[in-house]
Amino acid sequence: MASLAAACRVSARLAARKLQHDAAVRGFRSSAAALAAQNFMMPALSPTMTEGNIASWRVKEGERFSAGDVLLEIETDKATMDVEAQEDGILMKIIQPDGSKGVQVGTRIAVVAEEGDDITKLEIPPDEGPQQLKAAAPAPAPTPAPAPASPQPQFAAPTPSPPKASTKVPARKYPLLPSVHQLIKENGLDESAVSNITPTGPGGRILKGDVLAYLGKINPNTPAQISARFEKASHLDLSNVKVAKPVEPEKPQEEKASAPAPAPRAPEPPAKAVVSLPISLSAVLEAQQRINKKLGIFLPLSTFISRATELANEELPLPTNYQPTADELFDQVLGLDKVPGYVSAAKQRATRGNYVPDIKAPIPPKAAPKPKQKKIDIIDILAAAPKAKSVKPAGPSLVPGAVTEGLNVFSLQVPKTEERRAKVFLERVKHVLENEPGRLVL
């Protein structure tokens, strides 16, 4: 008995190992074997594709293929494209051979089986392509009348009505839209019925409303009314627009003569300020004499003063009412005003002055009365010896109102906002004329 139990355990182990081996060899399947072949339809390689040509089959009948393998080549009016397999399988039978032309999308072109199926025991499924739908389209089954309580009105019979003899449907220039193609397929309309549908879309396109009106599911006049409304709204109608009459401006009421309007007040002139500073020209006279002795060149005082004025007008402070320009505001946004040594062109022009001082000598003190001259006797003149004439040397050329000895008053009359600016100018003129006159020679 012990040996029999041991033998049973060994047999059970061997059976379990055999089952595990078979499962490992066969592998895991997401779907069971169908034991029936499947139709392979003509695919739509683009949204507007309706038919194509089969150039060649890459897989022959009875051959196996894997996911990603190229099954066949399809030619369209635009290009030749490969059709790849989405999963493993077997090509059981080719319905549309190489060189087939005008194969409609959705037509059966082959029969395939799943991997591991025995194709010798499988049956070919019936064709469910659009050809059967076309055959059944000429004789559609009558639809029963709706119940009286139905809220949807029936505008026409649901069966397609033949076109009127007087209505001429234009030839279709564009392919059907995907939504229109799906609606035609669902209602089983063939090509002859589609050619009788009156298009109301832009460029002669067939819309879904045209198909529904042809089938009698909506009012037949609705698509045309909608198309006419869109056509009218696409153009601006100005036929009813009337030009308004120009409105004359109202005349102001005449004012009474007893109360005349006050005269407009003239703007007040800006306040003025007088800035003055005493300056000595002694150092300038000494420099003038040295140049005359050493170089034999005589420079008048006006030259020294004009050069000193030119130097003093450079880089003056800005007026207190100075407004920055647009360029300066933009430079501030960029942070250029904080860059050391950066001065905008507008600020350079603003810091340049154009002052010309007014020079006056101080009023001298009241002169002492001159002694009375002695009465000249004619005898003394005749008896006196003749005197030699003395020639006075030419004196220095002076600026009108300036004196060579003492102090001269340099003054400016400027707006109140430039008072500080004028003081800086006069201080610079004073410094150059009294301390650095030689700087004005070059």
Swiss-Prot record:
Protein's cellular compartments: Mitochondrion
GO biological process, one term: pyruvate decarboxylation to acetyl-CoA
Residue spans of biased composition, Pro residues class: 139-151
Pfam families assigned: Biotin_lipoyl, E3_binding
Bias kind Low complexity: ranges: 152-169
Biased composition (Basic and acidic residues): 245-257
GO cellular component: mitochondrion; pyruvate dehydrogenase complex
Keyword Isomerase found: no
Location, primary (coarse class): mitochondrion
Region described as Interaction to the E2 core: spans on this chain: 317-336
Keyword tags: Lipoyl, Mitochondrion, Pyruvate, Transit peptide
Annotated spans, Disordered: 119-169, 244-269
Residue(s) carrying N6-lipoyllysine: 78
Gene3D superfamilies the record matches: 2.40.50.100, E3-binding domain
Membership in a protein family: Belongs to the 2-oxoacid dehydrogenase family.
Free-text note on domains in this protein's UniProt record: The sequence organization of E3BP is highly similar to E2, having an N-terminal lipoyl-binding domain (LD), a central peripheral subunit binding domain (PSBD), and the C-terminal core region connected by disordered linkers. E3BP is bound in a tripod-like manner and the interaction to the E2 core is primarily mediated by a loop region of E3BP (residues Pro-317 to Leu-336).
Free-text function comment from the UniProt entry: The 10-megadalton pyruvate dehydrogenase complex contains multiple copies of three enzymatic components: pyruvate dehydrogenase (E1), dihydrolipoamide acetyltransferase (E2) and lipoamide dehydrogenase (E3) and catalyzes the overall oxidative decarboxylation of pyruvate to form acetyl-CoA and CO(2). E3BP is responsible for tethering E3 in proximity to the core, forming the entire metabolon, and the number of E3s is limited by the number of E3BPs.
Protein name: Pyruvate dehydrogenase complex protein X component, mitochondrial
Upper taxonomic lineage: Eukaryota, Fungi, Dikarya, Ascomycota, Pezizomycotina
